[in-house]
Amino acid sequence: PAEFHAQTAVEAAMTLHETVRGRVDDIESIVIETQEAGVRIIDKTGPLDNPADRDHCIQYMVAIPLIFGRLTAADYEDGVAADPRVDALRDKMEVRENKQFTKDYLDPKKRYIANAVQVFFKDGSSTDRIEVSAPIGHRERRGEGIPVLEQKFVDSVSPRLGAGQWEALEALCADRDKLAATAVDDFMALLVA
């Protein structure tokens, strides 16, 4: 879960996690390139007092996946935000507008929300610059989104249902024709624990 303008920055940071995870203390700086709207709406410095502040801060949304390799709803809560590495990384970030990203954001044929992230280390080395133009689920990446949505459904629903109930729901969802023929009240009954 990430604010719209930061979704691709989060994906770039998750890609970089394996490269930086053992070197977080060695980071000199982090450059985030974004669209004008991203700079205007989610480039935030200073204290972030609550989850609503954090989910509208591109620096926070990049720091978490760089450190932990994930960004979940729980990562916006106080316990995760209290990790001193988060603010230490935020302080090392420079957010800048990439004019091409802004142009592509405003282009109705593209509607990209591109971001790029690159990490620079104290020893002078750096990661690759990871650029992601469109988030998973964008019309150009729709196919990549289906497995992600299916997994999100499994992760959200299966722990709340008994094994037999989950298996029945899973079997129904796997059969498109049977699912389409199922009355809404019968389907909803499968979701009640």
Positions of predicted regions on the chain:
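Terminal-appendage/accessory-domain detector
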Residues: 1-193
